[in-house]
């Protein structure tokens, strides 16, 4: 994380940003804070690479923390007024209290029932002298928080400003306030009088004093408050300290891999220590050896927890070791934002289950990361105990949120699954186990099976080996009514299902007290069937069948091939069929599908409860469908611009191939050989033009397979492989297989030999197009062939189009055709977003289809804003290829030059005069500073010198240098500071360091150093500066002695480094005689070198104790930051293995109090050169 924080105050919220924010980031943070402050929903599109993740995290967490900084409600410190006189028995004059001056809360309606007031404890009398002491109250609140239960969400708050109240309401409020202050004063009094007495003991004492208290009468106004523990919907909850209770932030994204990317971004921020957790499935977090290797991990996990086979999960019993935030954050490596893999490693080490640990951490977490189907699916919310009321929901990568919402409210079950559930319920009934609850559930399965069998005989043929029959939601309600499942009986069925899932049952023996016994329950697979059915039935019956019209119910029959069951002859011998083909049978599979066609059904559970919903992605366009489809009013919408310049991207449409044939990727044209050959020739031409990695996206796997077969037949595939390594995305398969294939692609680009990079042919909506990062050389061009419309013959697509057409006027939905096209644009934008992943990236976007040229108003309007603004239409492929060649050649030349300079720096590094550190840790070649202090009392001078080979007769022009006074070696904080920096250095091309220059290091056997060693024996290029100490410089004689920067303390004494310029260094045979250049006085320091937005003030010393540099918070400074885009730098946008020098420009380098003061040689060289020219 960058240590140079920029502070922005937006909407009254102070946001600590890890760098200078881009205008797109400022716009996003402004929209998010506005939405959170006003409880409005946000729809935000920001292109990939514009720092969207950092803006989301920083703005949301800053707003959340700002709530806890608000002052305590004045009502807590105000003495409650005496309530009006009451004639009830509990307030009569003859009513006496115990001699401990305890006042019984009016919330007690039985002698033994604890108070339902704040913290559930009784209160002292009003005459207690400590009741008005604020310090006592605060101390008591802190003490009470230790023993507080989990029911604080239902405590009634007091507002600073209240509307007019009736007399009865005033009396109720005073009674409540009285109770609240009694709690605080009592705890404070006990802490002062008896500090050694635990709270639990005092509570038991108070409980004993309640035994003689009669219940409240019905006339008492306090009793009217007794059953009113619910808060109004528009109130803000308070925590136990009287401050606003901070809403949790549920941060949902599409995949677990994207969660890992988000947590890495969180580590870069000032909010990296926020309490957090990550929810995941057992596939990602289970560590039990018997479960990990099992196909159905959930079922195996439940068996272990139930102890069915005499075994239990010892990992589950160790959850308490790390189940709270305080314990977790004090463990090694978990104090900052962590990833699920780190939790899994820690759980395996401590024998604690990571899956259940993550669930336990929800309670105290401020931010919860999870796949967003965890928030949309009601079953998963119930399983994970996710409560969204009053919380903040952020859904990143939400371009697929509509499909996910529909799937969350849909359910499919096969006839085989229903029969298995029926048989299992039968066995439990026959065993006389909870017979009354199991019988109604078994009847549901029986009725559905009979209905399936009856209607499967009247299915309509649809396509090859498939048939179906469809009912509307209202028609299905009539069928359910005939089965006995109605609005009145369904709640009873729900109670029966809850009962059969209870593992224990309380029984009372004849002679003995009540005890719990273990009861067998239904298997996990049967639970899934019944819970899924009850979920869709709940939607169908909810609110007088409000959502019934949003469903379609279908019986689908498909066929699958299976091996024939073994047949034995009369003698009992296995009869083997003569023809092996006859050993396989075709079996029909009937499935009952409840399809939700309206994503607003699933979103209704969220929209009615949460405080704010934030939908964001790089490819939300077009935005107009989200509000109508999700049933959510997005009052705040944003389409942010990209952070790159126009010269960094080439966007063009191509309507014809190299031979001039039109390319229209409709179904009719893609079947022709002419189209297939023309696309292949176009792809080959682009591969010969653009180097490194190229991605090609096709509309479907079916077309990919057709093209592959055709190109192999014609020899075009071989031609492609002669230029690049060609990889095709597989359909389905294991995740590990796909990851291995992807690694082959990366390696072909990184370690290219005879071939120039790699070509990856993928499919829109596939694995490659979703969430993968192809930055820099991994994707210098993205080619999309056609427009990826959904399969028009798909039954669900057809039903959805009909549904939208039917409700377009009544509900404001988009017509079916517009909805259909929008699905294609989103998939296309997602594929195009694989290229240009950060500010300094460059690449080409090639859209192959003549429909873009022929009807741009229709087909271009659906693309992302930053693509629409730069798209160019090319009338012929030749003109497009010419323009693409010039673009690629220009940028590739700059990239190659940067890489060459970087390689020169790395190759010459061992010949530099460097002071080796006492520690043998590997250091970064490109970022290490090369200092040789003479002794602990002298200051090192930074000298920029020119390297030359001894064989070169002429010297290059001298470059002016300047000295910078440094801190002394004896500073105790420098050694740890340097070591910490070396561990966190990026872009490491490591080299071993020697304790002295006089010693030769052992050769390194790494492949990269073999090439470096070969280069050391050749001519050394004059491109890398060195840092040389000044032996005779007196203290304070530095040219710039007013500005002191910290110096690492791991340097050798001067007597060990004398005359090292003539000694061998890393076995190099080249001796370089340094040429000292006189320093030229200069006072105009570059802020890019010293990472300050302003020039350093005189006599300013940057030391480990110095606070982190921050951007000015004034309005003028803020305007300057917005206007100056050239200096914006976001760590999120740079891959850890990339270097800033590749882009040919000097980027802000972060300096921190805990990092080394090392400057890269390139920075010093460029800075000194600039000074010399002025």
Curated annotation (Swiss-Prot):
Domain Helicase ATP-binding per the UniProt entry, residue ranges: 11-445
Residues binding ATP, per UniProt: 185-192
Location(s), subcellular: Nucleus; Cytoplasm
In-chain residues carrying the UniProt-annotated modification N6-acetyllysine: 1174
UniProt xrefs under InterPro entries: ATP-dep_Helicase_C, DinG/Rad3-like, Helic_SF1/SF2_ATP-bd_DinG/Rad3, Helicase-like_DEXD_c2, Helicase_ATP-bd, P-loop_NTPase, RAD3-like_helicase_DEAD, Rad3/Chl1-like
EC annotation from Swiss-Prot or TrEMBL: 5.6.2.3
Processing and modification events after translation: Phosphorylated. Phosphorylation is necessary for interaction with BRCA1, and is cell-cycle regulated.
Cofactor(s) the record lists: [4Fe-4S] cluster
Catalytic reaction equation(s): Couples ATP hydrolysis with the unwinding of duplex DNA at the replication fork by translocating in the 5'-3' direction. This creates two antiparallel DNA single strands (ssDNA). The leading ssDNA polymer is the template for DNA polymerase III holoenzyme which synthesizes a continuous strand; ATP + H2O = ADP + phosphate + H(+)
Motif stretch (Nuclear localization signal): 158-175
Highest taxon, organism lineage: Eukaryota
Phosphoserine: modified positions: 929, 932, 994
GO cellular component: BRCA1-B complex; cytoplasm; nuclear membrane; nucleoplasm; nucleus; replication fork
Feature: compositional bias, Acidic residues: 1138-1147
Polar residues bias locations: 101-126, 923-935, 990-1001
Binding site for [4Fe-4S] cluster: 286, 301, 313, 353
Motif DEAH box per record, residues: 393-396
Region listing for Interaction with BRCA1, in residue ranges: 888-1063
GO molecular function, one term: ATP binding
Positions of the UniProt region annotated as Disordered: 101-160, 187-208, 923-1001, 1102-1155
Pfam families associated with the record: DEAD_2, Helicase_C_2
Low complexity: compositionally biased ranges: 134-143
Family: Belongs to the DEAD box helicase family. DEAH subfamily.
Subunit field text: Binds directly to the BRCT domains of BRCA1. Interacts with the CIA complex components CIAO1, CIAO2B and MMS19.
General function of this protein: DNA-dependent helicase and 5' to 3' DNA helicase required for the maintenance of chromosomal stability. Acts late in the Fanconi anemia pathway, after FANCD2 ubiquitination. Involved in the repair of DNA double-strand breaks by homologous recombination in a manner that depends on its association with BRCA1.
Annotated protein name in UniProt: Fanconi anemia group J protein homolog
Organism: Mus musculus
Gene encoding the protein: Brip1
């Amino acid at each position: 994380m960058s240590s140079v924080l920029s502070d922005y105050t937006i909407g009254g919220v102070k946001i600590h940003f890890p760098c200078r924010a881009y205008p797109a980031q400022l716009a996003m943070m402004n929209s998010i804070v506005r939405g959170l402050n006003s409880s409005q929903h946000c729809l935000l599109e920001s292109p990939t690479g514009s720092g969207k993740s950092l803006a989301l995290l920083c703005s949301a967490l800053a707003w959340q923390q700002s709530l806890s900084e608000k002052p305590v409600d004045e009502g807590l410190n105000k003495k409650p007024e005496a309530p009006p006189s009451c004639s009830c028995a509990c307030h009569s004059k003859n009513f006496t209290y115990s001699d401990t001056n305890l006042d019984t809360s009016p919330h007690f309606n039985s002698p033994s029932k604890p108070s339902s007031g704040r913290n559930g404890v009784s209160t002292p009398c009003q005459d207690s002298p400590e009741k008005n002491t604020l310090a006592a109250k605060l101390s008591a609140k802190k003490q009470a928080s230790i023993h507080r239960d989990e029911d604080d969400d239902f405590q009634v708050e007091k507002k600073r400003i209240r509307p007019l109240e009736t007399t009865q309401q005033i009396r109720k409020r005073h009674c409540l306030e009285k109770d609240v202050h009694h709690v605080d004063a009592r705890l404070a009094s006990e802490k002062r009088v008896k500090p050694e007495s635990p709270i639990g003991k005092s509570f038991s004492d108070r409980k004993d004093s309640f035994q003689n208290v009669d219940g409240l009468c019905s006339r008492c106004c306090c009793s009217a408050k007794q059953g009113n523990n619910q808060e109004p919907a528009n109130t803000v909850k308070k925590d136990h300290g009287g401050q606003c209770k901070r809403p949790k932030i549920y941060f949902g994204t599409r995949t677990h891999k994207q969660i890992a990317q988000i947590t890495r971004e969180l580590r870069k921020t000032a909010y990296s220590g926020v309490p957090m957790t990550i929810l995941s499935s057992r596939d990602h977090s289970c560590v039990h050896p018997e479960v990990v290797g099992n196909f159905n991990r959930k079922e195996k996990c439940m068996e272990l927890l139930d102890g069915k086979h005499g075994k239990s999960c010892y990992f589950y019993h160790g959850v308490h070791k790390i189940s709270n935030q305080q314990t977790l954050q004090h463990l090694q490596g978990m104090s900052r934002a962590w990833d699920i893999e780190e939790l899994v490693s820690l759980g395996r080490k401590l024998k604690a289950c990571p899956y259940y640990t993550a669930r336990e951490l929800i309670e105290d977490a401020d931010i919860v990361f999870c796949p967003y189907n965890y928030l949309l699916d009601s079953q998963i919310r119930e399983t994970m105990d996710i409560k969204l009321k009053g919380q903040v929901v952020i859904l990143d990568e939400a371009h697929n949120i509509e499909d996910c919402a529909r799937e969350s409210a849909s359910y499919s079950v096969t006839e085989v699954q229903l029969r298995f559930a029926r048989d299992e319920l039968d066995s439990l009934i026959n065993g006389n186990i909870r017979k009354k609850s199991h019988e109604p559930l078994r009847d549901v399965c029986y009725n559905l099976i009979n209905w399936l069998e009856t209607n499967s005989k009247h299915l309509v043929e649809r396509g090859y080996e498939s048939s179906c029959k469809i009912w509307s939601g209202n028609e299905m309600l009539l069928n359910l009514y005939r089965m006995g499942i109605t609005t009145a009986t369904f709640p009873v069925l729900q109670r029966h299902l809850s009962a059969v899932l209870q593992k224990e049952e309380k029984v009372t023996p004849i002679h003995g007290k009540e005890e719990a016994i273990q009861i067998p329950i239904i298997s996990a697979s049967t639970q899934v069937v019944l819970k899924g059915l009850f979920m869709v039935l709940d939607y169908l019956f909810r609110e007088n069948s409000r959502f019934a019209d949003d469903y379609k119910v279908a019986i689908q029959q498909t066929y699958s091939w299976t091996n024939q069951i073994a047949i034995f002859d009369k003698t009992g011998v296995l009869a083997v069929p003569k023809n092996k083909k006859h050993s396989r049978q075709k079996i029909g599979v009937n499935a009952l599908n409840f399809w939700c066609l309206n994503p607003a059904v699933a979103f209704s559970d969220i929209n009615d409860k949460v405080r704010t919903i934030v939908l964001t992605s790089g490819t939300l366009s077009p935005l107009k469908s989200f509000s109508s489809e999700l049933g959510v009013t997005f009052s705040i919408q944003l389409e942010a611009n990209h952070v790159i310049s126009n010269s960094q991207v080439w966007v063009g449409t191509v309507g014809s191939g190299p031979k001039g044939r039109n390319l229209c990727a409709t179904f009719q044209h893609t079947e022709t050989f002419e189209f297939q050959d023309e696309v292949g020739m176009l792809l080959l031409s682009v591969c010969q033009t653009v180097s490194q990695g190229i991605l090609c996206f096709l509309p479907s796997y079916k077309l990919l397979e057709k093209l592959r077969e055709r190109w192999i037949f014609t020899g075009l595939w071989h031609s492609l492989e002669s230029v690049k390594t060609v990889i095709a995305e597989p359909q389905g398969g294991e995740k590990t297989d796909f990851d291995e294939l992807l690694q082959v692609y990366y390696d072909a680009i990184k370690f290219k030999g005879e071939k120039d990079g790699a070509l990856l042919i993928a499919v829109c909506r596939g694995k490659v197009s979703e969430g993968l990062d192809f930055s820099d050389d991994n994707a210098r061009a993205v080619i999309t062939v056609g427009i990826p419309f959904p399969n028009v013959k798909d039954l669900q697509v057809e039903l959805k189009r009909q549904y939208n057409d039917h409700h377009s006027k009544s509900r404001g939905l988009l017509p079916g055709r517009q909805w259909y096209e929008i699905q294609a644009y989103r998939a296309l934008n997602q594929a195009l977003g694989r290229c240009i992943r950060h500010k300094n990236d460059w690449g080409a976007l090639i859209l192959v289809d003549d429909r873009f040229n022929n009807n741009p108003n229709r087909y271009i309007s659906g693309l992302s804003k930053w693509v629409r603004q730069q798209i160019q239409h090319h009338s012929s492929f030749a003109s497009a290829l010419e323009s693409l060649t010039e673009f690629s050649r220009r940028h590739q030349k700059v990239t190659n030059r940067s890489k060459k300079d970087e390689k020169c720096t790395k190759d010459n590094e061992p010949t530099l005069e460097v002071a080796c550190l006492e520690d043998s840790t590997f250091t970064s070649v490109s970022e290490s500073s090369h200092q040789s202090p003479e002794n602990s009392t002298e200051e090192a001078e930074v000298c920029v010198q020119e390297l030359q080979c001894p064989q070169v007769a002429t010297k290059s022009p001298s470059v002016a240098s300047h000295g910078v006074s440094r801190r002394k070696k004896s500073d105790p904080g420098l050694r740890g500071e340097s070591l910490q920096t070396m561990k966190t250095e990026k872009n490491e091309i490591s080299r071993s360091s020697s304790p002295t220059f006089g010693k030769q290091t052992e050769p390194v056997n790494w492949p990269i150093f073999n090439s470096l060693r070969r280069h050391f024996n050749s001519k050394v290029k004059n491109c890398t500066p060195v840092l040389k100490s000044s032996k005779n410089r007196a203290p304070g004689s530095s040219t710039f002695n007013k500005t002191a920067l910290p110096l690492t303390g791991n340097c050798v004494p001067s007597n060990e480094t004398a005359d090292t310029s003539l000694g061998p260094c890393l076995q190099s045979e080249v001796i370089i005689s340094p040429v000292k250049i006189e320093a030229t006085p200069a006072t105009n320091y570059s802020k890019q070198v010293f990472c300050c937005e302003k020039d350093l003030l005189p006599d300013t010393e940057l030391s480990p104790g110095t606070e982190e540099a921050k951007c000015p918070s004034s309005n003028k400074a803020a305007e300057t930051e917005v206007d100056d885009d050239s200096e914006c730098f976001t760590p999120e946008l740079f891959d850890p293995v990339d270097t800033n020098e590749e882009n040919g420009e000097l980027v802000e380098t972060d300096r921190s109090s805990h990092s080394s003061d090392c400057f890269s040689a390139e920075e010093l060289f460029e800075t000194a050169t600039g000074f010399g020219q002025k």
